[in-house]
């Protein structure tokens, strides 16, 4: 059993009697949470793929050309292959070969990087400027903050290290404005709040200048 299959079993999103059903269910995740909770975050281009006999439906192994690493230097400084379930119903990820650069996030198991539909994976050219800046330094600064999801009103922050994420309340849904343009960063005084990035909120915390 691969790590992703085990995760889906724990989530209870499918039953053993219905392996072929469309069953991949993921909760929305802010890109900052995806960054902070991933072992590996990289920008890469897929240059090949093959199906290997692992698990009930096999595992897709993508060969990648790593362009840049944002997180995971101690876990796996250079990633050559990424693994995902072959079946989309088990959250397997389908990527184009020799076409796009991707932002890829995932976990490391037994020296291999695994990813899937519940990870934050996006074409690089689809990321906003704020998201790219987040990958470079802002998201890392906010990993001690907590992004609290709000699905319906009323909802409140309950501690000073929380940012209230309300994209799901918008008519536009997820991903919304906070996902695309904001990071939750600890401010002077120890509290966390959303930061758009016109100027560093506290130069003792963020040692960077926006272009």
UniProtKB/Swiss-Prot annotation:
One of its GO terms (biological process) is visual perception. Residues 24-27, 88-89 are annotated as: Involved in metalloproteinase-binding. Its main location: secreted. Keywords: Disease variant, Disulfide bond, Extracellular matrix, Metal-binding, Metalloenzyme inhibitor, Metalloprotease inhibitor, Protease inhibitor, Secreted, Sensory transduction, Signal, Vision, Zinc. GO terms for molecular function: metal ion binding; metalloendopeptidase inhibitor activity. Zn(2+) binds at residue 24. InterPro entries: Netrin_domain (IPR001134), TIMP (IPR001820), TIMP-like_OB-fold (IPR008993), TIMP_C (IPR027465), TIMP_CS (IPR030490). Residues 24-143 form the NTR domain. SUPFAM superfamilies: TIMP-like. The record marks 85 as: Involved in metalloproteinase-binding. Residues 1-23 form the signal peptide. Mediates a variety of processes including matrix regulation and turnover, inflammation, and angiogenesis, through reversible inhibition of zinc protease superfamily enzymes, primarily matrix metalloproteinases (MMPs). Regulates extracellular matrix (ECM) remodeling through inhibition of matrix metalloproteinases (MMP) including MMP-1, MMP-2, MMP-3, MMP-7, MMP-9, MMP-13, MMP-14 and MMP-15. Additionally, modulates the processing of amyloid precursor protein (APP) and apolipoprotein E receptor ApoER2 by inhibiting two alpha-secretases ADAM10 and ADAM17. Belongs to the protease inhibitor I35 (TIMP) family. It is linked to Sorsby fundus dystrophy: Rare autosomal dominant macular disorder with an age of onset in the fourth decade. It is characterized by loss of central vision from subretinal neovascularization and atrophy of the ocular tissues. Generally, macular disciform degeneration develops in the patients eye within 6 months to 6 years. This is Metalloproteinase inhibitor 3. It comes from Homo sapiens (Human). The lineage of its organism: Eukaryota, Metazoa, Chordata, Craniata, Vertebrata. The gene is TIMP3.
């Amino acid at each position: 059993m691969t790590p992703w299959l085990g995760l889906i079993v724990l989530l209870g999103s499918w039953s053993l009697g219905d392996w072929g059903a469309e069953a991949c269910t993921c909760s929305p995740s802010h890109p900052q949470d995806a960054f902070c909770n991933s072992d590996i975050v990289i920008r890469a281009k897929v240059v090949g793929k093959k199906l290997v006999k692992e698990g009930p439906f096999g595992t897709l192994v993508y060969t990648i050309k790593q362009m840049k690493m944002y997180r995971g230097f101690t876990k796996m400084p250079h990633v050559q292959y990424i693994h995902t379930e072959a079946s989309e119903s088990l959250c397997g990820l389908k990527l184009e070969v020799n076409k796009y650069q991707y932002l890829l996030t995932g976990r490391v198991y037994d020296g291999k990087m695994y990813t899937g539909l519940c990870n934050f994976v996006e074409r690089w050219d689809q990321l906003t400027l704020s998201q790219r800046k987040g990958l470079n330094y802002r998201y890392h600064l906010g990993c001690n903050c907590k992004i609290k999801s709000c699905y319906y009103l009323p909802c409140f922050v309950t501690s000073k290290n929380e940012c209230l994420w309300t994209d799901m309340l918008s008519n536009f849904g997820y991903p919304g404005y906070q996902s695309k343009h904001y990071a939750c960063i600890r401010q002077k005084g120890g509290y966390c709040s959303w930061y758009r990035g016109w100027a560093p909120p506290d130069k003792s915390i963020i040692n960077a200048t926006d272009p």
